[in-house]
Amino acid sequence: MAIPLSYNVRNLRLRKSLTIMTALGIALTVATAVFIMALLAGLGRAFGTTGDALNVLMLRKGSDSELAAGGVSRDAVEILKNLPGVAKNSKGEPLVSGEDILVVVLPRKGGTGETNVTTRFLTPIGIEMRPKVHIIAGRWFTPGQREVAVSSSINRRFDHANIGDTVHIGKGDWPIVGIFDASGTAHQSEIWGDLNQLGTDFERSIYSSVLVRATDPASAQALKNRANDDQRLELNGMLEPDYYASQTKSGAPIKIVGTIVAFIMAVGACFAAANTMYAAVAYRGREIATLRVIGFSRPSILTSFMLESLILSLLGAALGILLMLPFNGMTTGTQNQVTFSEVVFSLQMTPAVIVSAIIFALIMGVVGGFAPAWHASRRDILSALRG
């Protein structure tokens, strides 16, 4: 025979202060876990949604990053343009974009220091190959001019990043003529400028990377293999989504520190839950004995107290999730461990994050509640009745 759930709810309501304090402890732990998971989900979304399965990114052989690459020759780009399986635009131009990557230093808003920002130099074809990126204010840079467009995140997070301001690159100042939105992809952390003008300023005849659009998935794989095998090219080809997925190692420090903090807080929350349940057992000794006398078994009492602990943990989970809701979608940034420039992304409280938070809270409820529940189910009836 099972003890009614209403019995547990009534007892939690009778001890309001202790219930609230314990639920708040669990809530803060859950909120911390949600924050860390939302950060990682946001970072994963920024990199995971970047790229097209038909795009193949070519780097110099031995490189795993555009910034560290360099050395892709113009001759290699011309060879790539004439390979079978390369898509063309409506003008009949091969969708092959040689690109250069530099890092510039910008001051954060509020005087909170400076940080590195990735600056990508490309041609109009490179823009055409990224349909998720579009201008929301001003215009794109003019080919052959020292002009740049900045992402909306850069515009919000940094000083001197408005239309009309200038960014110092190489031999001169590059006016900002537009603001673009990159639909939450990794390009949301970038500044874009004209490739040919950069080559003139720096007298560069090589590219950091080359982006190639294939006509179909089979051609994309063939182009990737051709780049890796052709000794003339000396390139390392990879599908664009795979490249950006590999960049999620930027979240490793967040995951490590967050896991340690969440674990320490979880231990504290488990002790708080155990303390609450032990207090309930001590306070309700005669009740427990009476339940045994009228026919409730030890497993029923164990189950009842475990349910009470789980209800308490679910209450804490709900409070913790509610505490984090105002931060959902908040823009933040971290350092890319590959390029050492800032990656801008938004906190994402996805359904998976919320479900994980609830499971985390339930685990705390089980760990914190089992020992008191076991103690309650094993109490001697006569000694409990004597009080």
Model regions and ranges:
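Short cytosolic juxtamembrane segments of multi-pass membrane proteins
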Residues: 375-387
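Hydrophobic alpha-helical transmembrane segments of multi-pass inner-membrane transport and secretion
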Residues: 16-43, 251-287, 310-319, 363-367
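Short, membrane-interfacial amphipathic segments enriched in basic
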Residues: 1-6, 386
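Transmembrane alpha-helical interface segments in multi-pass membrane proteins
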Residues: 278, 283-332, 356-368, 372
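Mechanotransmission and gating elements of multispan inner-membrane complexes involved in transport
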Residues: 87-88, 107-114, 140, 156-259
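Short juxtamembrane loops and helix-capping segments at transmembrane helix boundaries
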Residues: 327-354
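Short beta-strand boundary microenvironments
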Residues: 115-157
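Hydrophobic, regular-secondary-structure patches
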Residues: 31-118, 137-139, 144, 200, ...
